[in-house]
Amino acid sequence: MIVLHARDCDPKACTALRAHRMGLVELTRHPGDVPTGAVVLDPTVEKALSREDRDAALERGLVAVDCSWEHVHRYFGPLRRRCRHRILPYLIAANPVNYGKPCKLSTVEALAAALYILGFRREAEEFISRFKWGPAFLELNRERLEAYRRAETSAEVVRVQEEFLPDGL
């Protein structure tokens, strides 16, 4: 797993930096370091992550981008043509900063969710358990994650997601 890191955050609170210090992810500041064909978690696209992305993630890598919304295009733009951009479906954050907020996942939560959806449940559990609040993320989202994991395609993930969306969202 790779994190493209913009250094926009408080280093003491940054889950991506903590994961890197623990040896759980590679860290880079340059979009050119991201392998061609990698699966990039991208909140600005419409195609949902699904098990059909599993082989690409295994062969080319799974990438999260840790940057402020002000710099989204600076980091996602250079990757647009050469990587698979996928959005995560509806999930609830359990990190201390955004606990209970929908779609406000930390970088570590996003990577754990992606692993789970791609079918790497045990690896997702091991990865997120390294963070004090990690098991809470899995428990809060267990039903959703299991349903997304069972979906074969992006279209199926989107259909399943509809069942979990609150009214008005």
UniProtKB/Swiss-Prot annotation:
The keyword Glycosyltransferase does not apply. Its EC number is 2.5.1.157. The keyword Cell division does not apply. GO terms for molecular function: 18S rRNA aminocarboxypropyltransferase activity; S-adenosyl-L-methionine binding. It catalyses: an N(1)-methylpseudouridine in rRNA + S-adenosyl-L-methionine = N(1)-methyl-N(3)-[(3S)-3-amino-3-carboxypropyl]pseudouridine in rRNA + S-methyl-5'-thioadenosine + H(+). GO terms for biological process: enzyme-directed rRNA pseudouridine synthesis. It comes from the Archaea. This is 16S rRNA aminocarboxypropyltransferase. It comes from Methanopyrus kandleri (strain AV19 / DSM 6324 / JCM 9639 / NBRC 100938).
